[in-house]
Amino acid sequence: MYEEFIKETSKFIFAENKPEKADIIFVPGNGYSQMAERAAQLYAKKYAPFVLPSGKYSISTGRFGGVLTGQKRYSGEYQTEWEFLKDVLMKNGVPADAVLKEDQATFTWENAKFSRKVTDQAGINIRKAIICCKNYHARRALMYYQRAYPDAEFRVCPCCVDGITRDNWTESERG
């Protein structure tokens, strides 16, 4: 019974889809480069015309916690998660005019809610979107973005960070 519980919980938390053509790619804020790198790959393959990284910093620290992966390549003096993620996107081939700006969010619901304000102000109607996030953050990100964009369809294209996967998340405190 415990194994079935873990299996079903893992399936729920670690939401993942194959990418499809979309109106935008969302990247909730953090200090990991992988999600923005994945978004840049999807942009290069023409999955969406815009990428919207979102984030000021974590509400729990009150400052940008720094670059957690890719420090050699992304060595700027970043004040916000958005500044960092924009740099990652641009260094991976996404032009500045395809990167939208949301730099006030301090937690996941704000990432989604404030991103909605940005797309509404830009006149971008979101019918389908891709979310590039941490794999163990996938369900939470999906639920918040669905709440902010109730009429949109979402594809979650997560990245593995911290070595945490659906197969091992129960084996560590971090998972």
Predicted ranges, named:
Residues 1-173:
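A structural signal for short, hydrophobic/glycine-enriched beta-strand patches
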